[in-house]
Regions:
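A solvent-exposed interaction/effector surface
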Residues: 2-222
Length: 222
């Protein structure tokens, strides 16, 4: 699939479910509770959820483009049930190994230039391991993410690696100040929640880093 066609598919899909801020808010996302919040920083406790993910060996941006085409075909009926699966957020992407990772329901997640990237869509909660349609493309797999604590840094702006890395540094600085430790082997994830035609200054982007700190004294997410 050409890069032009992938961009058209991405725009058409996201436009159909995120045509307005109200629609974007209605997109299903993984369940979580907020443990701590301070400006752009949050510590969240996520419930278990399923991902449809694929790996691409390429640069930061191209990996996301290639992976999106595979995952889009999966939720469009390229699965054993031949059924369409609802769009979720975010789309997650992260670099495999090297202490960095990524995951899609309402953001798109992604991590560092050059290497193997994992890009994923979040599977709607109505499915479990036994009922989720299985991919027919062997490059796409279903993976269960266990309950875990995630440190989050929210930001707006363009989906460049430079922008992502700048805010990753801010998040890691916050973790050091709080005495929180990243999970061994986990990469920083970029989570993207908005359509590409959303003005860059209005986009919701997040850096996600799994941490070992137990999530206590949680309150429900808004």
């Amino acid at each position: 699939m050409s890069s032009v066609r992938r961009r058209v598919l991405l725009a058409a899909l996201v436009a159909s479910v995120m045509a307005s801020p109200e629609a974007a808010m209605a997109i299903e996302q993984p369940e979580y509770t907020v443990v701590r919040q301070d400006g752009a920083f949050e510590l969240r406790r996520y419930a278990p959820y399923l991902l449809a993910e694929t790996e691409v060996e390429s640069g930061f941006m191209e990996a996301g483009n290639v992976a999106f085409g595979r995952l889009f075909r999966y939720i469009s009926g390229d699965n054993t049930a031949r059924t369409e699966i609802a769009m979720t957020a975010p789309v997650e992407q992260a670099k495999r190994g090297g202490g960095e990772k990524i995951a899609m329901t309402a953001p798109v997640e992604q991590a560092r230039e050059g290497g193997v990237y994992r890009v994923a869509f979040v599977v709607p909660r109505k499915y479990d391991r036994d009922t989720v349609p299985q991919p027919t493309d062997p490059r796409v797999r279903i993976r269960e993410v266990p309950a875990r604590s995630i440190a989050v840094w929210r930001y707006s702006g363009r989906w460049t690696e430079e922008n992502f890395r700048e805010h990753e540094r801010e998040l890691r600085g916050k973790l050091a100040a709080l005495g929180l430790k990243a999970e061994p082997g986990d990469s920083a994830i970029i989570a993207r929640y908005d359509a590409p035609f959303m003005p860059w200054f209005m986009r919701r982007n997040e850096v996600l880093i799994p941490v070992t700190e137990p999530a206590a004294s949680a309150r429900p997410a808004p």
